[in-house]
């Protein structure tokens, strides 16, 4: 009982440490959106119309994660996610299938960088 009270009293201090999300934020939803976008980016490059649709879907998922990460106090992670969302959104304006392939690879790399940042530094 006493140990539980001590942990409860220290929880706000522990959550304030760098690398941890703020309490009561939906960090898991942001992580899941990032994973979903990574799965889409890892698929083989589609044709032009399918590529535009995939870019829109990736961008939508990534943009949904940005306010979650900001609300959790993860500004750097939100920034990396925003860059990935911008690259995915570029796919919607592609004029050739070859552009889709290149743009998807750029978005995939940026998503991978965001995930790597999250794995190495947590919520920052």
Set out the residue ranges of the language-model regions:
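Mature extracytoplasmic or organellar-lumen-exposed domains after removal of signal/transit peptides
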Residues: 19-124
């Amino acid at each position: 009982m006493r140990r539980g009270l001590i942990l409860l009293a220290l929880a706000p201090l522990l959550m304030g440490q760098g690398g941890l999300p703020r309490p009561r934020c939906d960090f898991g939803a942001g992580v899941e959106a990032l994973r979903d976008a990574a799965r889409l980016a890892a698929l083989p490059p589609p044709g032009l119309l399918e590529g535009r649709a995939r870019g829109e879907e990736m961008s939508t998922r990534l943009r949904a994660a940005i306010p979650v990460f900001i609300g959790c106090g993860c500004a750097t992670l939100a920034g990396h996610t925003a860059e990935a969302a911008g690259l995915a959104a570029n796919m919607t304006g592609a004029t050739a299938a070859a552009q889709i392939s290149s743009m998807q690879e750029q978005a995939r790399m940026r998503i991978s960088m965001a995930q790597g940042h999250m794995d190495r530094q947590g919520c920052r």
